[in-house]
Amino acid sequence: MMQKYQDSSLSPEERASDLLARMNLDEKFGQIQCYNAIDSFLGKSVEKQNPYGVGQVCILIATMLDDVGSAAGLITRLQKQIMESGKHHIPAIFHIETLTGVMVTAATSFPCGLGQASTWDPEQQQKMAACITRQGRAMGISHALAPVFDICRDPRFGRMGETYGEDPTLAAAMGTAYVKGLQDKHRMSACSKHFLGFMAGQGGIHTAQAVVSPRELREVYAKPFQAAITDGKLDSVMNSYAAIDGQVPAGSKAILRDLLRSEMGFNGVTVSDYSAVEQLESIYHLAESPADAGRLALEAGMDQELPTIAAYNDELKENIRSGVVQESLLDEAVLRILTMKFRLGLFENPFPAENVQAEITPADTALNRKIAQESMILLKNDGVLPLAKSVKKVAVIGWHADSVRALFGGYSALAMKENTLGVKMSMAGIQADADSPAAENAVQKTYPGSEVVMENPGVEPLARRCYPDAYSMLGALRLAAPHTEFLYAQGYPYAGNEESGHDAALQIAKDADLVICTLGGHYGWNASCTTGEGIDAMHIGLPVCQERFLEKLESLHKPVVGVHFDGHPISSDTADRVCNAILEAWAPGAQGGEAIAALLTGTANPCGKLPCTVARHEGQIPVYYNHPTNTCYSMTGGTPKNAYIDGAHTPRYCFGHGLSYTKYEYDTLRLEKDAIQADGVLKGQLHVRNAGNKAGTEIVQFYVHDVAASMVRPVKELVGFAKVNLQPGEEKTVCLSLPMSQLAFLDADMRWKVEHGKVELMVGASSEDIRGKAEFMIVGDAYPDGKNRSFVADTKIM
């Protein structure tokens, strides 16, 4: 006889409730645990570790396997063992990182998070996520640990490159699109992270305490999560490591129950960041034992502990059995987990596709190349780009120029795979084995003048073997411009003060019509990297070896193009002075080399815009465009001049900045009405025209400023944007619909309030390049439900 939970015609909630009622304590407890698939290679079988079944499986080991078929085979074997371990045959959820694509080398590898944000293209983001879902689910992966919703205003923080930048509206738009694309038709579940305020850590230090007020926590840091919960029906959330106001999210009722569930209306599954529950005892000393840490987390509303059994252990289970810990806490967690499994269709389709092969279609590659091209930002250009036909000989200099590895950042499959070559890994929650063969053979030599371990010589051959169709920037340039001679010298590394290669590089520069210098660090996951998880820095500029080379190059009076690779934006007085043009390339992924070549040669027109403000110096940090009135670089009093005694308050490059090979003209911003009820919608429009002779794409940005308010408000805030494709001479109309609920802020009583008064609407090509303004009046006050307010204004192009 079919049981209710076996009836696929019933809702996931009904099926989960029925199954939960049939499970004993041991079976239920297994659902809040995770098995790390790497243990299957270490003699620790899933049957032995999780004899009553398991809720999740960490499948990061798939990155180390040779092909998709091997990964799918491992998932099939483990899933069969798990389902056979219990009378209800409950399948496990298999999770993997998907920030830049499914984290296996046979899947599509997209640009890093900052690069994705720089496209300002939610529609494209949704397509990217759909590609990730198709490739991941075919392998048997059902839980994607992405997107990253952290708001980052500090380039010292090594994980900035994972984020959508500094603005909550842009992050909400991009991340919600990712969630919708990934969760379409319930094929995979997205896991947004890290809740909450993670990258506001003091000193730009990974996992350090975040000093954020309750108001800012909700208005800024929670906004992308809220948008994904409300508009994207987000399935799961991962906690932050960072303590906030004395509380650690993994064990905080105030954060997980009161804020996330009660205030924000989240009813999905919460999962711990790796080892975060155990750290309540081992690092934060909030518990007396791992099991006590597990109790704190379960009481706080943490549903599953990843990536392996630590605090959700047998002692905690026996404490539940004896009544020391309430079984109802376990039941509510398991109910949510089972509901997600039924929603994903795992009971009907628990295994990978049969005979699965790598399926990177031509459409996937084209999408990846388009995202890579549009992720890059032309920060500066005096006319030297695109490369003129008169340029016959180009000197290309820098480690990144002829490196395929340089195209990939942290949370890419390649960054994970290179850890097999023996350099100490930096991923949080994963302990390096000091006695492993890899550690034994680790390269310990560092770049002179730094603590960065020299790159293993096997990394580049590994990169080219894993991505045989990927071109380095140099290789792509030679293909894109076959009649131009490209001379190459490494010149300098990506860290330290080594100058021994300068002379050879300067020699080829003397003979060239133009010089391309690749600049920046090494973005990844181990001790040979300069930025990444657990790899933070005091200095935000270029390494000394690159700065000194640029100073020497300046004396040759050659046109210089700088191409910057990294997980944070370029910040260099020397580069600004010496380079005639600067292209920010971030970590552009497998198609990055060809994307750069297309932009430099002019077959593509740059259209990326900065998702972050670029500081001149680390002493300015934090510097961000939507700062409160009379703060940061908008000070209006209290100092003799609007500057430090040794430098400007203003940033190097502003949020939203990005140049093109054409020019765009904006006409007058017109409003349908200049008085809007507090629960109404403002409508406006303007015309944008391509006034140049090259087709291009402009990102039209809308900002608001509260003229007078009851609380100190930001000097301006992004409310919406439109990406407009224009042929030479073409004009299009951009229409804006802005619900007043999007302008709600927390009043003195911490209620969401749309407040009566004047508001200035601005439109521009960046946060500082404002092309038009219009003022309107909000009539009356309104108190919207914070979780159902508007998050991103709607725009249409006609």
Task: Outline where the language-model segments fall.
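Short beta-strand elements
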Residues: D769-D785
